């Protein structure tokens, strides 16, 4: 029997350690949480993507009474960016959550769901460019250098050949 050990390198930063670009992206995701539509979960999520041309696009979770018809913030931002700027690689993505009845972001990070990870991976592969991921909580910010590192055993376009 052969054993594989899969590891993910995550850099844990205090907010004051973030560079200007990362802080700007995280702040855009925080601001986006206030436009979330989350009347059922009361859990607002904001995502911000930075494109290769330095444009920042934001998205929020959009819930619907007919579960699972809603959409996560990450996919809202990525799909908009990819449809409106199809020639611009996504270079970074920040994700933030907060309780809808609070003005403060959640203490802990909000990791992306499996569907969002798959879309993040596809976006990274589509452009052939790494997408840095910032998972932001009030305590600290986790930074992963590539979206593919969040989904080590992934289903990609090569599987369809």
Task: Describe these PLM feature segments.
Residues 58-159:
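Zn2+-dependent cytidine deaminase-like catalytic core
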Residues 1-27, 101-103:
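Short, compositionally biased leader-like segments
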Residues 27-34:
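Short Pro/Gly-enriched beta-strand edge/turn motifs at strand-loop
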Residues 44-51:
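Short beta-strand scaffold segments in enzyme catalytic cores
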Residues 38-41:
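Short loop/turn motifs at secondary-structure junctions and domain boundaries
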Residues 11-13, 34, 129, 149:
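Histidine (H) residue identity feature
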């Amino acid at each position: 029997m052969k054993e594989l050990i899969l590891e993910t390198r995550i850099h844990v930063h205090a907010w004051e350690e973030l560079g200007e670009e990362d802080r700007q992206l995280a702040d855009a995701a925080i601001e986006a949480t206030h436009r979330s539509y989350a009347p059922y979960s009361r859990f607002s999520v904001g995502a911000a993507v930075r494109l290769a041309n330095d444009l920042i696009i934001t998205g929020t979770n959009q819930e619907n009474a007919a579960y699972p018809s809603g959409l996560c913030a990450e996919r809202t931002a990525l799909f908009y960016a990819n449809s409106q700027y199809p020639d611009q690689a996504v270079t970074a993505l920040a994700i933030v959550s907060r309780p809808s009845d609070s003005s403060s972001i959640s203490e802990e990070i909000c990791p992306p769901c499996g569907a969002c990870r798959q879309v993040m991976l596809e976006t990274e592969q589509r452009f052939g460019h790494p997408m840095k991921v910032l998972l932001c909580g009030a305590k600290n910010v986790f930074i992963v250098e590539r979206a593919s590192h969040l989904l080590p055993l992934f289903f990609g376009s090569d599987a369809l050949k």
